[in-house]
Curated annotation (Swiss-Prot):
It catalyses: a plastoquinone + NADH + (n+1) H(+)(in) = a plastoquinol + NAD(+) + n H(+)(out); a plastoquinone + NADPH + (n+1) H(+)(in) = a plastoquinol + NADP(+) + n H(+)(out). It comes from Calycanthus floridus var. glaucus. Its cofactor is [4Fe-4S] cluster. The keyword DNA-binding does not apply. HAMAP family: NDH1_NuoB. This is NAD(P)H-quinone oxidoreductase subunit K, chloroplastic. Its EC number is 7.1.1.-. NDH is composed of at least 16 different subunits, 5 of which are encoded in the nucleus. Belongs to the complex I 20 kDa subunit family. PANTHER family: NADH DEHYDROGENASE, NADH DEHYDROGENASE [UBIQUINONE] IRON-SULFUR PROTEIN 7, MITOCHONDRIAL.
């Protein structure tokens, strides 16, 4: 803005009134203050790490990485999520204050990737655990794609209504799809599953009263046969 534009700006702002709603003001203030919690478990997270450098400079979007979920309003999941990691991911999401958003980055996070076909311990999509706002496919996605996903999330934030978002989250909660597994007793206890096998009692384990009672009840005709 040069010096010739200042008088025009003064004339327009002296008699101008900006009218807005509290919801729009809240959305506008959050557009450039997204604080992400980085949840990376695989190679996709390396592509996100390149955004921190000077070439892409993701600080210009107001992104400030946080190490605590209580200080973050955006969680970016990248990589494979296993069954053992699922409770930790849900716990991190629940500790984030409202409003909060999720970006699923990479094929392994969205669908389980190549590990979902033969693996029994891979979660087939992070949206089965937490609600996802933006899906970012790729193996791995490029840094430009991550910037595009953040731009789309900012557009979604600018148009959303807070009450509608709370209502949709209560209707579409996490754990929508159950993984069908049958829990059985573990046989790797050092006993080689002996508790699961039937063992006939030996003669020494039978009480003497039972043995002589059975012997006296047998007739001589049965003994001859």
């Amino acid at each position: 803005m040069n010096s010739t534009e200042f008088p025009l700006l003064d004339r327009t702002t002296q008699n101008s009134v900006i009218s807005t709603t509290l919801n729009d003001l809240s959305n506008w203030s959050r557009l450039s203050s997204l604080w992400p919690l980085l949840y990376g478990t695989s190679c996709c997270f390396i592509e996100f790490a390149s955004l921190i450098g000077s070439r892409f400079d993701f600080d210009r979007y107001g992104l400030v990485p946080r190490s605590s979920p209580r200080q973050a309003d955006l969680i970016l999941t990248a990589g494979t999520v296993t069954m053992k990691m699922a409770p930790s991911l849900v716990r991190l999401y629940e500790q984030m204050p409202e409003p909060k958003y999720v970006i699923a980055m990479g094929a392994c996070t969205i669908t389980g990737g190549m590990f979902s076909t033969d693996s029994y311990s891979t979660v087939r999509g992070v949206d089965k655990l937490i609600p996802v706002d933006v899906y970012l496919p790729g193996c791995p996605p490029k840094p430009e794609a991550v910037i595009d996903a953040i731009t789309k999330l900012r557009k979604k934030v600018s148009r959303e209504i807070y009450q509608d978002r709370i209502g949709s989250q209560q209707e579409n909660r996490c754990f929508t799809t159950n993984h069908k597994f049958h829990i059985e007793r573990s046989t790797h206890t050092g006993n080689y599953g002996q508790g699961l096998l039937y063992q006939s009692p030996s003669t020494s384990e039978i009480p003497s009263e039972t043995f002589f009672k059975y012997k006296s009840s047998v007739s001589s005709h049965e003994l001859m046969n």
